[in-house]
């Protein structure tokens, strides 16, 4: 297959050269179109050239993310051609300057695509697919859709730093999470779009704009596991002191549906903010390219997956949603819910069987969770049967194993990433990897010991960092106390893990083997790998084949 640059030369007098000289020819072409400002078309209007350029750039972005680099290169060329012809006759000086900046950016990206992805197969004789990343996951890229399809959708809620959106055609709701594109594709970081991961939120579609990748994700309505546990403790405490027998029976019969009372959405939204904001304000208010809209855009994040939580820190600058009720936990940091457990609550577990209980964290302003999954000075109690924790742990393990098999590391798995569906099963928020999205870790996940000690350092991360996070989450579920609370000075190479005496021996053994300071010594690494982790006595009653099925 010949290179696009060989087929689409701008000047009719030039003859195509052999593909062996494709790289030099591409550079010649790019240099030519940089100097073609004088070759304008007199009758081209402002509206025509911006609309035509937007069409070409949108197609280039879609093909770029889908890793169809030859088509992307072609569309970038066409888009730049249109802009160069139009800028010559555009009377608006401010708009001309903005267009020049766009041209520079598109030329830079076209050259990067050629140098990184197109020259290698042609010059080395390799197959055209030889430099394309993540080929085994290419079928999932059929989920890519035109970003304009999002424009008709209505924002009905804001859940932390993602948007709850309604499809006007079906009336169904889904979650939209935006990831900022850095426009510098990493050669080392491949694009990996996981699919078929059990116990993880499903990616339904994704959309590409000039500056962002928008993930269209399944809406898991159960809220976070941590909010469920805290509300259960509160409802049981309330049931002991007040409430009808019928209400207490209902809570016992529906343990997985007894979630926090839906919170009212923020008020004071401005007109026009009930639509998805696809782009930030532009350099020039008159310049709209690639489906851009001059409106406030969602907070952009780099990693994690979304239905009720995200895995990056920072405050949200999302547009406020229309008033109404959101039927899942949507409380922001610093806002209290009537259903939240009171500070200082002490609840004595009752009933037969091994029951685990302890002191957990209360409400606090944290990037991890607004429902108690971050640092907190308040103390709340929950109790969970070890068998139930074992089931949730097995579901988390299966999800992490599948992500690792597809080449994805979570790095900062924390309570905000653990959702609970209406059947009571764990659902991880969505994790993926994009060559154009710079990975970031939640700083508070590191500070609160949810992330492994090596995260944020200079050493290359392995699956071991997720097994630490897995152990940290299990520590909190089993003991009721966060790892950072029981180890306020952190965990070093010679730190002795603090475990309550009442913890079962298999549970204590599992936590000790997972929370090893040295990554290579953690359970799940080295000889035996994940199989050794699955065969640990703590999971002796788990039927793994049925769990995956």
UniProtKB/Swiss-Prot annotation:
Active site feature: 412
Domain of life of the native organism: Eukaryota
GO cellular component, one term: ribonucleoprotein complex
SUPFAM superfamilies tied to this protein: MIT domain, Protein kinase-like (PK-like)
Record-annotated Protein kinase domain positions: 145-539
Documented EC number(s): 2.7.11.1
Top enzyme category: transferase
Taxonomic source organism: Homo sapiens (Human)
Residues where ATP binds: 151-159, 177
Stretches assigned to the MIT domain: 87-115
Encoding gene (name): RPS6KL1
GO MF terms, alphabetically ordered: ATP binding; protein serine kinase activity; protein serine/threonine kinase activity
Disulphide bonds in the chain: none
Residue ranges, annotated region (Disordered): 260-325, 330-349
PANTHER family, sorted: RIBOSOMAL PROTEIN S6 KINASE, RIBOSOMAL PROTEIN S6 KINASE-LIKE 1
Keywords from the named record: ATP-binding, Kinase, Nucleotide-binding, Ribonucleoprotein, Ribosomal protein, Serine/threonine-protein kinase, Transferase
InterPro entries reported in the protein's UniProt record: Intracell_Sig-Traffick_Protein, Kinase-like_dom_sf, MIT_dom, MIT_dom_sf, Prot_kinase_dom, STK_RPK118-like
CDD domains the UniProt entry points to: MIT_SNX15 (cd02677), STKc_RPK118_like (cd05576)
Short name of any one Pfam family annotated for the protein: MIT
Protein name: Ribosomal protein S6 kinase-like 1
Presence of the UniProt keyword Nucleotide-binding in the record: yes
UniProt catalytic activity: L-seryl-[protein] + ATP = O-phospho-L-seryl-[protein] + ADP + H(+); L-threonyl-[protein] + ATP = O-phospho-L-threonyl-[protein] + ADP + H(+)
Family: Belongs to the protein kinase superfamily. Ser/Thr protein kinase family. S6 kinase subfamily.
């Amino acid at each position: 297959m010949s290179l696009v640059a060989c087929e689409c030369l701008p000047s009719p007098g030039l003859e195509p050269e052999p593909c062996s000289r494709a790289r030099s020819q591409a550079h010649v072409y790019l240099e030519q179109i940089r100097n073609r400002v004088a070759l304008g078309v007199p009758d081209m209007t402002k509206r025509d050239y911006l609309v035509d350029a937007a069409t070409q750039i949108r197609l280039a972005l879609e093909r770029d993310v889908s890793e169809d680099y030859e088509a992307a290169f072609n569309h970038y060329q066409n888009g730049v051609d249109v802009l160069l012809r139009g800028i010559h006759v555009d009377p608006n000086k401010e708009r001309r300057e903005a267009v020049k900046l766009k041209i520079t950016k598109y030329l830079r990206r076209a050259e990067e695509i050629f140098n990184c992805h197109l020259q290698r197969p042609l010059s080395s004789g390799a197959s055209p697919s030889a430099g394309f990343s993540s080929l085994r996951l290419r079928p999932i890229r059929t989920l890519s859709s035109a970003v304009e399809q999002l424009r008709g959708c209505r924002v009905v809620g804001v859940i932390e730093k993602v948007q709850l959106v309604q499809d006007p055609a079906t009336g169904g709701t889904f979650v939209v999470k935006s990831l900022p594109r850095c426009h510098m594709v990493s050669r080392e970081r491949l694009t990996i779009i996981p699919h078929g991961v059990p116990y993880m939120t499903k990616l339904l579609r994704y959309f590409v704009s000039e500056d962002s990748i928008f993930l269209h994700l399944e809406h898991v309505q159960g809220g976070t596991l941590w909010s469920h546990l805290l509300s259960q403790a509160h409802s049981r405490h309330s049931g002991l002191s007040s409430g009808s027998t019928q209400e207490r029976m209902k809570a016992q019969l529906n343990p997985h549906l007894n979630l926090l009372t839906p919170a009212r959405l923020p008020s004071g939204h401005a007109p026009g903010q009930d639509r998805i904001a696809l782009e930030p304000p532009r350099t020039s208010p008159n310049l709209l390219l690639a489906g851009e809209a001059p409106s406030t855009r969602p907070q952009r994040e780099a990693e994690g997956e979304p239905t009720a939580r995200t895995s990056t820190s920072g405050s949200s600058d999302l547009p406020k949603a229309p008033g109404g009720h959101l039927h899942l936990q949507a409380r922001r940091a610093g806002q209290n819910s009537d259903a939240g457990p009171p500070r200082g609550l002490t609840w004595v577990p009752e009933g037969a069987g091994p029951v685990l209980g302890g002191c957990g964290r209360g409400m606090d302003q944290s990037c991890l969770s607004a429902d108690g999954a971050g640092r907190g000075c308040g103390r709340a109690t929950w109790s969970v049967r070890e068998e139930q924790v074992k089931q949730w742990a097995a579901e988390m393990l299966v999800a992490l194993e599948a992500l690792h098999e597809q080449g994805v590391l979570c790095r900062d798995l924390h309570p905000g990433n653990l959702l609970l569906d209406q059947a009571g099963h764990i659902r991880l928020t969505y994790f993926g990897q994009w060559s154009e999205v710079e990975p970031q870790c939640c700083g508070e996940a590191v500070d609160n010991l949810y992330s492994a000690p090596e995260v944020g350092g200079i050493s290359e991360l392995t699956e071991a960092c997720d097994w630490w996070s897995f152990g940290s989450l299990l520590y909190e579920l089993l003991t009721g106390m966060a790892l950072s609370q029981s180890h306020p000075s952190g965990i070093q190479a010679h730190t002795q893990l603090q475990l309550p005496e009442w913890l079962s021996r298999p549970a204590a053994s599992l936590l000790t083997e997972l929370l090893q300071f040295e990554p290579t010594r953690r359970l799940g690494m080295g000889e035996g790998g994940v199989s050794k982790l699955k065969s640990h006595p703590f999971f002796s009653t788990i039927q793994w084949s049925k769990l995956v099925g």
